[in-house]
Amino acid sequence: MAINGNASFTMKDIARELGVSVATVSRALKDSPRISTEQKERIKKFAREHNFYPNLTAEQLRHNRVKPSNIIGVIIPQIAHYYFSTILSGIEEQARIRGYSIMVAQSEERYDLEKRICEHFMENRVCGVIVSQAKDTVEYDHFKKLAVMGVPLVFYDRICTGINASRVVVDDYMGAFTAVTHLIETGCRRIAFYGAPMKLEISKNRYNGYRDSILRHGLELDESLVFICDNRADAEELTPKVLSRDDRPDAFFAINDDTAIGILYTAKRMGFKVPDDVSICGFTNGERAVACDPMLTTVEQRGHMVGEEAVDVLVAHVERLLAPGKIEKKVVRTRLVVRGTTR
């Protein structure tokens, strides 16, 4: 028994195409030591290319080893990242309440690893997948395979616009709009934006909030103050150049706290007083926001709530509480937390 995009495709088809026995195919897909590594990889590769995955749960049921899957697959870009760890906490807690377990894998922001994780989830017959895509993911066939095989998908934080799937996001646009409005209302006029690559929906939305706040308040939108910079190391490298300009900014809005803290320490090292000479606002409200001096003004994302909502949406799909094909979009509100890096 297997799950695949073509219901007529079987182990017999694989055996015929590769010139081996059905028993050899079966052993290879079960990772039997009786088959050479080279032969196993050849058979597994062919099976993957044809969307054929052995139904391990069904095999185990025949031997009365497990109950049907109630396992949710979770793909997280970086477990060590504060925001993602709070989302994971919300997912785990809500899954437990709803009677599900989770299988967690870290993509490390790598497309190739993300693909392998999806294959692993399919082989283990998870009942659904909650995922935030890796930064370098630009092709989505691995997600489409899940959808074709009837595995519900829910995206969080970084959503995949190439797939019609449910998603849970924070209100990135309004969070950015509110943050930049705060900077303007406290006297800032030249506000730099440090963002992620614009292929990511969150970066587009936060940039749009930044831009619209500036224009709404009658200020000039200076695109020379818009940079792709989304981590502390890059911020510490870029900021000296930005603050050395004759027309330097008097404020920074950063796409995350890590980047904002890189700006903060660089500005202080250069002799600027924060917030008197330059104001800084981040986006996360993680533990580091209160560990720096001065403490960071930032936008709170409420990751735990994002995780809870993602589980609820996925379970609604798994338990058929939503009509087939219905797409849910949940938006979690942000909150501006004003501290010492703004006036």
Each language-model region and where it sits:
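Short beta-strand segments enriched in small/hydrophobic residues
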Residues: 17, 22-27, 62-80, 182, ...
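N-terminal helix-turn-helix DNA-binding module of bacterial transcription factors
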Residues: 1-68, 343
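Short acidic capping loops at alpha-helix termini that bridge into adjacent secondary structure
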Residues: 190, 221-225, 274-279
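Flexible loop/turn connectors
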Residues: 238-343
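Alpha-helical recognition/docking segments in bacterial nutrient-uptake
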Residues: 1-6, 10, 66-181, 185, ...
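Hinge/beta->alpha junction and helix N-cap segments in small-molecule ligand-binding domains
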Residues: 76-86, 104-113, 135, 158, ...
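Short acidic/polar active-site loop segments enriched in Thr and Asp
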Residues: 21, 127, 189-190, 250
